[in-house]
Every structure is written in C-alpha cells, then in structure tokens.
Amino acid sequence: MNNRLNTTSSSEESRFLEEMKRKRVNITLSDTEISGVIQKITQKKTLILEDVSEVRSGRRFPGAKLIFGKEIVKVEFPLSAGQASVFSNEKHKSEFQTFKKKMTLDGEEDGVSYVLIDELHEKFGPAVMHIQEQDVIGIGADVYGQSGQERLCWLQVATKKVVYLFDILLLGGPAFKNGLSMILENTHILKVLHDCRCITRCLRTEFRVQLTNVFDTQVAELLLFFNESGGFLPDRPASLPELLQLHLRLTTAEIQPLCSKQQQSRECVQLWYVRPCPPDLLSLMCSSVQHLLSLRLLLLDALLADYTVLVDSFMSSSHCPPLHFQQDECAVPPELQELMCVRQQRMDWASQCYSQTDSGLLQRSSFKASPHTPADAQ
C-alpha cells in the first residue's frame, strides 16, 4: 500500500469511500473511454468498477473491471438518472453559470500565466526544477471535505511570473515523492500562504509532508491588528480578499472572483472534484495565489513600522550629543519610554472605532472611521 496514504484516518477514508461509492463515472484511458459505477476505491488509487461499458461503442464488459490510477487520463461524473453529480440539479447548474459570468480576472493581463500539471510527464519535472530555484513562493490549496477531514484536490505554487496548478487528485502521492515534498519541506524556500492550517493538516495527514519556513498572511494581519489597536484582537481573522483590498488597494471588481470562489466552495462542496476542470476555475485558482508575494512585502513593512520609527529616532538623537554621554547611553532612551503612551493612544482610538464583543474582541464589521488614525499616535 502507498505508505503516504496509510496515515489517513479510518473515519475520513470511510466517509470518502461512502460518498464516492455507487456513483457513475466516465474514465478516459490512454486508448479508450469507459463508463461504470464505482464499487470500491483502494488506498493505491485503484478503482473497481461494475456495470462497465465502452462509451464510444456501447460494448458492455461482464463482471467488475479493475482500473489502476496510473492508467487514468481523465475522470468525469456524467449526468444520469439516479446518480449524484456536481451539477445534478438545476440549482447547481444555475449557480455554476452565475459563477462563470462573474469571472473577470485574466492572468495574462496581470503578467501572470498558469501551467496545469495533471501528469508526471513533460511539464512536471521542469516545473519542480523551476520552483526549486526560487527563494520565495506563494502556496494555495483547494480541498474537499469538512474541517479536519479534508482531502487535498489542488495545490497551487506561485512564482513571480508563473502559477503552477498541480492536480493532486490525479497525481496522487507520486507527485510528492518526485519533487513536491522536497519543495514544501525545504527550509531555504519561504512559502507564503493565507491561513496555513488546512493545507498543513492535509499534507501531514495524507502525504506525511511537513510544511516548513512559512509566512502566513492571515497571522501577519492578526499581529498587525494587535499592534495598531494597542493590544486588542479582532473577532475573526481577515479573509484574503479583505487583505488584498486593504493593503494592495485592489478594487471591489478585482476581488469579486475571490469572493465568488469562497461562496461557491461553500455552496457546491464537490466543486474541486470536477474533471476536467473548467478553464474559468483554473484561472480563479491562479488569481487566488498570484498576489501573495506582493502582499507579504507590504505586511512586513507594516509590521516593522514601529521599529523603523524608533531606529530613525535613535539616529536623529545622535546629532545632538547628550551632556552626560555615559549615563544617557545606559538609560532607557526616551523614544522607548514613549511606546507606552503610543500604545494607550492606539487603544483609545480602537475603542472609538470598533464595537466590542462580550469577550472583549473588536468587531471588524463595526469599524467607524475616526479623524485620528493609529499613525497619528506615532
């Protein structure tokens, strides 16, 4: 058995198998396309199908048919009576059409293109080699399943000019054995993510991959909020669209696709299981990671703002030598002593601009602009 999949909990495996069992599936092999009902999925990603027929000729095969994962080129869930599908009812059809109409981001316009990688030939090796040459990369993931029981479907890796979309459902464990693990566990490559919890859990549980050297934009924003409010915490973490709008100044129209992605992922839980994946979804996956590298730099600058101000103050004070040089150098500089006053001023500002929950957290949605900003307190 694949050792990387043995770590999957028995409850998760049972749930996943039960959801996929008895569904009709179309499978494209290298030389033909067959249709059948899923009877079993093994831990080696081998399918056992029953009621099997060849799509083109309609010829039926007696008994069950064994399909090895490495033989599969494409997987589709067709619409048929009595069978569940991602778009098996009019509601989902309507939702998906609305979703497609809202797609406005074009990676080419922003100087970023994407590369789809769904097999371990041709593009996979060069992609891994290119990523390994980077010092900083953006990482994103799309999963299927409830929190704590997710299954990794897509892994996105962003460089400055290219986003690689790895189809983990098709690639499986061999993708990590052949290079992805070395990238994700490399302590010399900084990985920028937004909310690292889900992807860290999936990588560790499914593939025994330990993600290292991570910059989490969601964590960075929480710390920045804490600093700018004088010690308060928000009632919830910020979403990626919120950060892109606040720090990168993206317009509402520019972040709308990301908002749509979050909504559609909630309403259509099997969205990331669709094979072949619609081009609009591929573009959307690209857009969800292409800004992470720029966002990291802005958040770092914001987090270091107080530090920069203090260094400038120290340098300015050096132009006016104190009368008692030795004594002053041993004492705590006045600039540092002022930090407590600045902190109190920021707390007062935050108390005026936000409503508090019963737990003492600040409600993000209640923000009211104030004539005095945290920057005025510096």
From Swiss-Prot:
One of its GO terms (biological process) is piRNA processing. Pfam families: DNA_pol_A_exo1. Residues 112-304 form the 3'-5' exonuclease domain. It is found in: Cytoplasm. GO terms for cellular component: P granule; PET complex. The keyword RNA-binding applies. Keywords: Cytoplasm, Meiosis, RNA-binding, RNA-mediated gene silencing. InterPro entries: 3'-5'_exonuclease_dom (IPR002562), piRNA_biogenesis_EXD1 (IPR052144), RNaseH-like_sf (IPR012337), RNaseH_sf (IPR036397). GO terms for molecular function: protein homodimerization activity; RNA binding. Belongs to the EXD1 family. RNA-binding component of the PET complex, a multiprotein complex required for the processing of piRNAs during spermatogenesis. The piRNA metabolic process mediates the repression of transposable elements during meiosis by forming complexes composed of piRNAs and Piwi proteins and governs the methylation and subsequent repression of transposable elements, preventing their mobilization, which is essential for the germline integrity. The PET complex is required during the secondary piRNAs metabolic process for the piwil2 slicing-triggered loading of piwil4 piRNAs. The 3'-5' exonuclease domain lacks the conserved Asp-Glu-Asp-Asp (DEDD) residues that coordinates divalent ions essential for exonuclease activity. Homodimer. Component of the PET complex. This is piRNA biogenesis protein EXD1.
